[in-house]
Amino acid sequence: IHYTKDQNDKDILCDESGDKQVMMEWEMGYMKECIKRLQPKGHVLEIGFGFGYSAEAILTTPGVTEYTVIECSPEVWDRFEKFRTKYDENIKIHLVRGRWQDVLYTLGTFDSCFFDDYDYTNKERDRFEKFEYEFMKNNAIIGTRLGYYSTCEKRLGTPEYLDYDTRPYTTEIPEHCRYAKSVF
């Protein structure tokens, strides 16, 4: 994964080949709204760092005491290390290098979690459902909040042990964005 600019000089994150878009600047407002709706608290786990839009929203939310992010890209690790220096020394900030599939089970429990990884397989629902199962089994406690970024309009099923809430969010998506639908 590497950082670059699109044809409008806006930030964009692409895969190693530069052909597949991973994240674009237009997502900033949506990511911040996701975190606002999640209302994270306590020790927060984030899957995927990207540009740090959601991380910034998490770290500026009152009641967040610790932040851990799992990130698999070395280029993103470098950006994260610069990012972390801007935040309150009273909040413990951790970077776990690797894929969530390989490291999640080694971590403890969390009060909140935001899932926004890069989809290497194009099977978003399968990937999130696997994560949700593993996270709930190994890392959640009673009252844990779980939120995620999705361009899917509907969720196929919700486990009965979860309260599930979805509300639409409308944003302007640039025409040259190849990975998101025009309306969420």
Task: Please report, for each region that a protein language model flagged, where it lies by residue.
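S-adenosyl-L-methionine
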Residues: 70-108, 112
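Conserved SAM-binding motif I beta-strand of class I
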Residues: 66-71, 148
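Conserved SAM-binding loop of SAM-dependent methyltransferases across substrates and taxa
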Residues: 51-64
